[in-house]
Amino acid sequence: MRGAGWWSGRETALLVAIAMAISIAVVALFLVRPWSGAQSGPPRAVIVDQLTSEMPKPPFVEATSSLLEQAGYEVDYYWGEEITVDFYRELPTHGYDLVLLRAHSGLIQGGDRDGEAFLFTGEPYSGSEYLKDQRAGRLLMATYGLGPDPSFELRDLPRYFGIVPDFIESSMMGEFDDTTIVVMGCNGLTSESMAEAFIQKGAKTVVSWDGLVTGDHTDEATERLLQLMLTDGLSMGDAVERTRTEVGPDPWYGSNLLFYPGEEAVSTIP
């Protein structure tokens, strides 16, 4: 009879094999964790459609998804109330190569951050949620209208959480991995605050507008930009310049499509 402390060669080999399997599994978990930036397989894109609140997948989304899929991308789509504070918080962890932010955006008015850009979520504002971020000034109450109108007051407008550049740098989890980010809403590059925050968070290039922009115009320009880069193989700088020439500035507000930082003119998306 074998003593309690005695192991046969077969049992010893089995224990070693189990230990090795556990070690390999642990290593694998670290290799595939979503915030590592390392990934295999086809490039990935996401369309973040905060503008759509009632009926998902407007024509722009259908056309752009088809264009991306033909170029070999896996495409995810989120819309409306799915675009929460925590959705933005976790966005870098998903390993996207291309992020299309079809979302309202604007400029902070007044205070120390006057003129900084911010992004709308689709999550109704509450003074009792995300208190740490609110107290730190990384979230704000965002609302919008068509302009001064005596028929309504501020309290009558819908209110949403908005995220500011400091939220991108300090509250988003993980890092982007040389991601191209297209901010399709207004004023994304009126100042460089939001774009620089994305760059500091690991993005490669940010594309947006230097003023107000209408929904139809940003849809048309973004679709053409992607065609030029994905189908024609143009660099970011050349594609933006060509889009400006072909599509032109916004017909109502005169805003222009820009990209940041300027030295990324030769970059392409996967």
Q: Where are these predicted regions, by residue range?
A:
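Catalytic cores of nucleophile-dependent amide-cleaving enzymes
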Residues: 126-219
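Short coil/turn linker and secondary-structure boundary residues
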Residues: 7, 82-83, 231-234
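Active-site-proximal C-terminal subdomain of hydrolase catalytic domains
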Residues: 179-270
